[in-house]
Amino acid sequence: MIIYNTLTRSKELFVPLDVNNVKIYVCGPTVYDFAHIGNSRSIVIYDILFRLLNVLYPKVTYIRNITDIDDKIINVAQNNNQNIYDVTARYIKAFNEDMGRLNCLKPTYEPRATENIDVMLALIEKLINYGHAYICDNTVFFDIESYPAYGKLSGRNIMELIYGSRIDIEVGKKHPGDFVLWKPATDIDNKLMSCWPSPWGVGRPGWHIECSAMSYNYLGENFDIHGGGADLQFPHHENELAQSCCAFPNSYYAKYWIHNGFLTVNHEKMSKSLGNFLTVRQLLDSGIRGEVIRYIFLSTHYRKPLDWNDNVVSNAQESLNRIYMALNVTDERLLLDDVEVSDEIISCLKDDMNTPKAIAVLHEMVTRINKASDIDKKVYFIKVLIKSANFLGILYHSWQEWFKVDNDQDIIQLIHERKMAKTNGDFRKADRIRQILLDKGIVLSDNKDGTTLWYRS
């Protein structure tokens, strides 16, 4: 398998630390709201990686954390007169429901930050003892100048990192780029139950130490792959890497770093203030199927930017319609035990998770099915298509379910009249009937055997 390693800025042959247990850590959601489509793209991408690695290796340990303590969570809890656990319980449940509807597999473990406070405290103490962290007014800061390699992940020097990114300027820092490991509790923290005792007083962790603690607790000092969105590369992942390597001097933390590209909406950054902030829940409730959302994410290479717009949604729906149309051979569920996922699909994914190429292979399979005249061969091709598409997390419906076919007698009667008109050479009437049906939201597809498939658009 070849993957692009952000750390080395090059494609590399993936060589796991232990071929018997590949270890992955991916930054999961901060649960203060429903998951937006930018977050969800990342979840789908690493779901594909998880599926692929499970084919290539006997065991994969996939950790995807939940950030359940954060300023945004505290703000929501305060505004709704709740404690943080009420807020996070609601949105963790919603997140798992939404990702299930995108056909994402569950990770091996899904640790919560609040369940790993003791590990964070131990790491912070190590950093203080090793001279990489200092205390100022009950706040513990990481000293970035104590780590000479700081900036190697993002490829910029310290001054560029400071002036080119969002960094909190706080009184007491030795250096403007130093970041918080532990902060003292406020009155609001005490009220909302968002603080814990520590050697430096009651308080709560900084964001970056959370992921270092959870990855260490579940995967150890070193692991194979760290994934996340490109927006996390700096400062979050840079800070994770620095503090983990300093806490464990013989560690390099993650061997491979993978970052998926940004997502925009109508060529603009997604923002609540612009009114273009889209959540998966909103899209699902509007009638856009989870399979369509997933197909859109897979149609663009994970490292490239993706623009979400109406045309993208429409094209994905039409593409899936074409694939499902090819299944219109039998009304029965096909058993797939005697076929395997196409080698072409696996090869595409082994090349830096080239999902657009894998999608193209599915459409080549559809062409092969449509051209096949032998029914047994056609059914075999369909089974391989379904097995391969299922591996990508799509094509889980029967064609009847997808097109929502029912026994509407009025529609069937119009289709019969259209067929008779064509038989009698009255093509104008046939076209008028097709248009009448189209106006009703009914799409027709004429088969070579003279039958007509219809579905509601």
Curated annotation (Swiss-Prot):
Motif 'KMSKS' region, residue range(s) on this chain: 269-273
Q: Which Gene3D superfamilies match?
A: Cysteine-tRNA ligase, C-terminal anti-codon recognition domain (1.20.120.1910), HUPs (3.40.50.620)
Q: Which GO biological-process labels does this protein carry?
A: cysteinyl-tRNA aminoacylation
The record's top EC class is ligase
- Do the record's keywords include Secreted? no
The principal location of this protein is cytoplasm
EC number(s) on file: 6.1.1.16
List the record's Gene Ontology CC terms alphabetically: cytosol
Subcellular location(s) per record? Cytoplasm
Q: Which SUPFAM superfamilies match?
A: Anticodon-binding domain of a subclass of class I aminoacyl-tRNA synthetases (SSF47323), Nucleotidylyl transferase (SSF52374)
Cofactor annotation:
Zn(2+)
In the record, what terms sit under GO molecular function?
ATP binding; cysteine-tRNA ligase activity; zinc ion binding
User: What keywords is this UniProt entry annotated with?
Assistant: Aminoacyl-tRNA synthetase, ATP-binding, Cytoplasm, Ligase, Metal-binding, Nucleotide-binding, Protein biosynthesis, Zinc
Describe the family membership recorded for this protein in Swiss-Prot or TrEMBL.
Belongs to the class-I aminoacyl-tRNA synthetase family.
Q: What name goes with this protein?
A: Cysteine--tRNA ligase
> What species is this protein from?
Ehrlichia ruminantium (strain Welgevonden)
